[in-house]
Amino acid sequence: LLDNFLAEKFIKKAGESTEYNINIMDEKGVIIASKDAERIGNFHEVAYWIIHGDEEIIDVPDGGKYLGVKPGVMLPIEHRGKRTGAIGVTGEPDEVRDIAKVMKFAIETMYEFES
């Protein structure tokens, strides 16, 4: 399982490289780490969908339609073939999609080496 320590460590390092907010959600769709500390502990509806569904990426142009969601891009975090969480980058989807893909790759790589 994705743990808070790893998620917080990732946010601290990766957050330095982008102006955009990054959120990491656990398997229940709860934000466990974020550049925006006020969001930690909140349920994220789209994260829950992507963790328990089969979508590879979800663009959210209007976050207000969903519980705990702001505009951005959401991707699943996968570890050894299982979805264990989600990572999202807040912003206009066309602007943050590539950043979100890099963040997904980075956290999955970190997760693999640290677990």
Annotate each language-model stretch with its function.
Residues L2-S115:
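Hydrophobic, helix-rich cores of sensory/ligand-binding and other regulatory modules
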